[in-house]
A protein has these predicted regions:
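Short beta-strand-alpha-helix junction that forms the catalytic/metal-binding core
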Residues: 73, 105-139
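Terminal non-domain segments
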Residues: 67, 108-111, 123, 153-157
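Short cysteine-rich loop/turn motifs with clustered Cys
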Residues: 24-28, 59-106, 136-138
Length: 158
């Protein structure tokens, strides 16, 4: 399996003490500027993009999980024939599911308040191979729907 982990780009959104969005690029504390939505300049945007794609590869992680699970849905056990595996994986016939979703980590009090905490939480827990599994599209929808239903019931009972 790959030693690289995935971190979604949105994990790097940063805010100053006043709650204003500041540039996501590491070490930059400037306020974002139009026309950019997450950066202060084109240079910062390009630097961050290069760093992000060099260090974090979601496609690679997904591929590792699909291979580990032998291109088989871990719930219904539907197995994709070898000749179709790459095609189905690419067309999203298979999906990589987070067993413990990000929203639950936040509810449990895990910290995403600094860049270091975001990277640590994401790489060590959220996108750890033990927290990922291969599901077919239908099973992934069912799992997500059930999680949302249980979450809604829990929220109502509080």
């Amino acid at each position: 399996m790959s030693s690289r982990n995935i971190v979604y780009i949105r994990e790097f959104d940063k805010f100053n003490n006043n709650g204003c969005i500041i540039c996501r690029n590491t070490g930059c504390e400037n306020l974002i500027k139009s026309p950019f939505r997450k950066y202060c300049s084109k240079e910062c945007s390009k630097q961050f993009e290069k760093w992000y794609y060099h260090n974090f590869y979601w496609d690679r992680v997904r591929s590792d999980i699909f291979k580990r699970d032998n291109y088989t849905c871990q719930i219904c056990r539907k197995k994709y024939p070898y000749t179709y595996r790459r095609k189905f994986a690419r067309s999203r016939g298979l999906e990589c599911d987070h067993i413990i979703p990000r929203s639950l980590f936040k509810k449990l009090g895990y910290r995403f308040d600094s860049l270091e905490n975001k990277v640590k939480m994401t790489t060590e827990f959220l996108h750890n191979h033990d927290n990922l599994r291969t599901l077919c599209k239908d099973c992934h929808k069912k799992v997500t729907k059930e999680y949302l239903r249980c979450n809604e019931m829990h929220t109502r009972s509080m």
